[in-house]
Amino acid sequence: MDKFQRDGKEDTSRQWRFLYPLLFQEDLYTIAYDHYSNRSSSLEPMGNSSSNDRFSFLTVKRSISRIRQQNGSIVPFVNCDQNKLVGHNKSFYSELVLGGLTAIPGVPFSIRSKHPLEEXNEWTSFRSIHSIFPLMEDKIPHSNFILDIRIPHLTHPEILVRTFRRWIQDAPSLHSLRSVLHEHRNLIISSNLDQLILIASKENTRLSLFLWNYYAYECESLLVPLWKRFSHSRSLPYESFIERTPFYRKIEHIAIFYHKYLKKSLWFLKDPSIHYVKYRERSIIALRGTYLLVKKWRYHLTNFWQCHFHLWLQPYRIYIDELSNNGFSFLGYLLSAKMXPPVVKNKTVDDPFIPVLIXKGFDPAAPVXFLIGSLVKEKFCDISGHPFSRLAWTGLTDDDILDRFDRIWRNIFHYHSGSSKKDGLYHMKYILRLPCAKTLACKHKSAIRVVRERFGSELFTKSFPKERESIFLPFSKTRSQRERIWHSDIIQRNPSVNPWWKEHNLRIEPLFDR
């Protein structure tokens, strides 16, 4: 293991070529076997299913060796009853090779990690979600257009084989990978990532996620260098920033004696506002420029996917949002950049005055209509807000009923506490109070008025007052105008972070624990 780690440090290019050394070197089979047999490793035990009782890395290696000795031009397809590539039962060898492909790729990633994956807490595992909001709070107000990109999903196994071809230098390994992907097409073909996870079996879910993440990495690895080159290049203005060329030409004619320092001045004058955020199968590119520049970006992105991956990209997968007119939905929020006049007081010798300064500000809003629709879906109320009692909870104690409603409210409020306006959240709290009171009234066979008189202020606010004081303390007492507005204390991912617009063909997960 130490030798493999040292070799990885000597040549960093090997970290993305792990399939070749891990599947076709002697000592790494021992590493993978130790990693697989160790119960404390990050891999899940695979002994629950009957197919994995026959699994062994020695059998996998022998089957791969037999594959290498065959004619590589023969490719098995889904409709074949007999796998000619291995000469024996198709399902037996494909399951063995699939098991090896599932277990072995996790070895180099676990070596690169300082701590085992099972020791990582929830905050560490979801830290990337936390970093998205401060980035947007700082960068989005300086942008005026958003490219909302849905990463196109794979439609054919050969697309993945072509991407692996650049990293794997052994042709027989590509044929073995092709045979597995053709037989298990449901691992890569789906309408969205959630459906991909649901279709894949329990044993193959890790491989499905690995293939999807590798494909997403390929998309980003070829685009991010272009963005960095665009934002950090020191080339002439007419080569990089066509919109500002007339302005720079005027500078050349007016300030001729600054010609030697013109290039350095352009470094400070140019516009590098290009920001990229990705979550799951959705990417956001924030741009500052003209509408023509944004259309060019969409045109080039479309051509990139069509030419590089031989994949047709539907036009609706790259949507242009103008921040000045509309917002966009991301991670369960409605995000926009609105013009807000900050209060600035200036004092002079004669008399003080307040100038009017118009600046853009980041405006996150909670989607109240969507949250109310989620309450309707979970049968807490109807579409008009009329409450329903939870008859299934009437057999619980009063404290359990209060705790369940209180947990629902805290989950909603903690995640959406970064909203600039919280009137809609308090409206959600008022709607949830009524089903809570009605459930208790059905249990005690009394009226809602009697329940309110009995529980008083403890109704649905059993543990909320202390949290409300701690959450609003930065906003009401100690927060200055220069501080961030994002004080949300999220400790786990809320299902409401998934986008909800039906026109984007995305699925909404339930918000509440049943």
Curated annotation (Swiss-Prot):
One of its GO terms (cellular component) is chloroplast. Keywords: Chloroplast, mRNA processing, Plastid, RNA-binding, tRNA processing. Coiled coil: none annotated. It is found in: Plastid, Chloroplast. The keyword Plastid applies. GO terms for biological process: mRNA processing; RNA splicing; tRNA processing. It comes from the Eukaryota. One of its GO terms (molecular function) is RNA binding. Usually encoded in the trnK tRNA gene intron. Probably assists in splicing its own and other chloroplast group II introns. Belongs to the intron maturase 2 family. MatK subfamily. PANTHER family: MATURASE K (PTHR34811:SF1). This is Maturase K. It comes from Lepidozamia peroffskyana.
